[in-house]
Structures are given as structure tokens and as C-alpha cells.
């Protein structure tokens, strides 16, 4: 049986990258929304806390940012994130979008996994149709 060529390997890497990002999105939203009282307060008032309190929480925030940077870089290495995409900007965009769900998403009335799949679709496959094409 012939060995898969580089194109097949590239598709497999992209699927693996997409799975890593989609899984991270799902876990973030599941955890974030499950502990919404704490996370809501943390996200909304962090900048207003006294410097000493912010400083005590900063290490945990930095570790979480580093985790997301690692996820993004792993996806980039697998061919799932364009080389020109700035890791920090992508992380801030993604976390900001997911954290904003506190404002409008009600886990009692909606499905978190469905929401995560929609976010992953937007991030991984984009919004616009391919240039010159129509869907």
C-alpha cells in the first residue's frame, strides 16, 4: 500500500490542530460558565482591584495565558494557524470572545457544547467565503 504523501500529512496535521483548538475552546467555556459567579467577578472587576490583590492573582492569569499560547503554537506547528497570526493577539481575541459569554449566555437555557462548536467553527473556518467564491 502506498504511503500517504505530504498533502495527506498536511490534512492530518490540520485536523489534529483543529481538534486541539476546538477542545480547548470547549473546556474553557465549560469551566468558565460552570463557575460563572467566581469567573464573572474575576473577569469584570480584575482591573479595579487593589494592586496587591491583582498581584496575587496575576501569576495564575499568566499561567493560563501561557497555556493558551502553547495551544496556539501547537496548532501553528501542525499547520492549523497561519504563521503570520500573532499569538498574543489571537489569544486575547479568543479569550475575550469566550469571556464575553458571561454577558449573554445562560447555561440553563443553552447547550455549552453547541456554543463551543460554533466558536470553534468561527475561529477555525472563518466567517467569509473563499475569495472569489460564493456559498
Functional labels for PLM-detected ranges:
Residues 9-38, 90-94:
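Hydrophobic alpha-helical connector segments
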Residues 52-78, 88-96:
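Amphipathic alpha-helical packing segments from all-alpha helical-bundle domains
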Residues 18, 22, 54, 87-91, ...:
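Short, structured helix-loop boundary elements
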Residues 23-30, 34, 66, 70-78, ...:
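C-terminal peripheral helix-coil segments that are non-catalytic and often amphipathic
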Residues 8-14, 42-46, 105:
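Secondary-structure edge/capping motif, primarily at the C-terminal ends of alpha-helices
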Residues 33-52:
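Amphipathic alpha-helical segments used for helix-helix packing
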Residues 80-82:
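Conserved hydrophobic residue
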Amino acid at each position: 500500500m502506498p504511503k500517504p504523501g505530504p498533502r495527506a500529512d498536511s490534512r492530518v496535521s490540520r485536523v489534529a490542530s483543529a481538534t486541539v483548538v476546538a477542545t480547548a475552546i470547549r473546556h474553557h467555556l465549560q469551566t468558565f460558565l460552570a463557575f460563572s459567579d467566581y469567573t464573572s467577578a474575576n473577569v469584570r472587576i480584575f482591573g479595579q482591584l487593589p494592586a496587591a490583590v491583582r498581584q496575587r492573582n496575576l501569576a495564575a492569569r499568566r499561567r493560563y495565558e501561557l497555556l493558551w499560547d502553547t495551544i496556539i503554537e501547537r496548532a501553528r506547528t501542525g499547520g492549523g494557524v497561519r504563521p503570520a497570526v500573532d499569538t498574543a493577539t489571537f489569544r486575547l481575541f479568543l479569550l475575550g470572545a469566550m469571556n464575553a459569554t458571561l454577558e449573554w449566555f445562560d447555561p440553563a437555557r443553552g447547550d455549552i457544547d453547541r456554543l463551543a462548536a460554533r466558536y470553534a467553527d468561527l475561529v477555525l473556518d472563518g466567517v467569509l467565503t473563499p475569495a472569489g467564491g460564493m456559498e
